[in-house]
C-alpha cells in the first residue's frame, strides 16, 4: 500500500502542473513468458504464462519540447501463473513418478519514467513511439506445489513450498497512435524479478531469475489539463 501511495503522490505532483496530459490505459498481454527456473537439472516451470494477464496504468506527462513528452507512470500488472512442468522423477524419502510442478506467478506495481515522441498527424491520427523505465515492486501470487501420481493416476502426495519474489527493474518500448484523445499501442515490456523457493519438507532452497516479458496491447484515453 505504501508503494501505491508513493506512486500516486509522485503522479499527482506532475499532474498539478500546467499543461499536463493524463493518460488512463488498460491492456492485455498477448504472449507472456517467464524465465524457466532450473533446480539441479529439473525445470520447475515452463516459460509460457498459463492464465490471462492484464494491466491498468495511469501516466502524467508534459510536453518538454516540440512533440516530446516526459512524465511519470504507475501501473498495476497482474501476470498469469507459469504453465506447470510435468513428468519429472523426484527421489527422496518418498518417490513420485509423473510429477507435476506448479510455480506461482506474481503481480507487479511499477513506478516509471515515461518518454513519448509524437509524429505529425495523418488524417487526425497521431502516431507515436514511447519508452518506459522504472522500478517494479513485485508480490508473489501463491505457493510452489509438487504433486505425484501413482500408476493408476490417483494423487499420491503433494508438497508445498514458500515463494518469495524480489523487486527489480521495469522497462518497455513500443508504438501506437492517438485519435481524438483515444489511444492504442503495442508495448514490449519486461519486469525483472528473482524467485526464492523454499521447500522445507524436502530441505530444498533455491533462488533464480524469474523475469516476466510480453507484448501488451493497450487502449486508453488522454485528458488535457
Model-derived regions, located:
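Short glycine/proline- and aromatic-enriched beta-strand/turn motifs that initiate or cap beta-hairpins
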Residues: 17-62, 140, 214-216, 222-224
Amino acid at each position: 500500500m505504501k508503494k501505491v501511495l508513493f506512486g500516486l503522490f509522485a503522479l499527482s505532483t506532475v499532474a498539478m502542473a500546467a499543461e499536463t496530459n493524463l493518460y488512463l490505459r488498460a491492456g492485455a498481454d498477448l504472449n507472456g513468458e517467464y524465465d524457466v527456473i532450473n533446480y539441479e537439472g529439473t525445470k520447475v516451470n515452463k516459460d509460457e504464462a498459463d492464465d490471462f494477464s492484464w494491466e491498468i496504468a495511469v501516466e502524467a506527462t508534459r510536453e518538454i519540447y516540440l512533440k516530446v513528452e516526459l512524465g511519470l507512470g504507475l501501473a498495476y500488472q497482474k501476470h498469469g501463473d507459469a504453465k506447470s512442468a510435468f513428468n519429472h522423477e523426484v527421489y527422496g524419502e518418498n518417490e513420485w513418478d509423473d510429477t507435476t510442478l506448479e510455480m506461482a506467478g506474481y503481480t507487479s506495481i511499477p513506478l516509471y519514467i515515461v518518454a513519448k515522441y509524437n509524429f505529425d498527424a495523418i488524417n487526425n491520427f497521431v502516431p507515436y513511439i514511447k519508452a518506459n523505465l522504472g522500478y517494479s515492486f513485485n508480490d508473489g501470487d501463491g505457493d510452489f506445489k509438487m504433486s505425484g501420481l501413482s500408476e493408476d493416476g490417483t494423487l499420491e502426495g503433494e508438497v508445498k513450498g514458500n515463494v518469495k519474489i524480489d523487486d527489480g527493474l521495469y522497462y518497455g518500448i513500443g508504438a501506437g497512435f492517438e485519435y481524438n484523445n483515444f489511444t492504442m499501442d503495442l508495448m514490449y515490456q519486461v519486469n525483472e524479478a528473482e524467485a526464492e523457493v523454499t521447500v522445507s519438507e524436502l530441505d530444498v532452497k533455491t533462488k533464480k531469475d524469474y523475469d516476466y516479458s510480453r507484448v501488451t496491447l493497450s487502449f486508453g484515453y488522454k485528458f488535457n489539463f
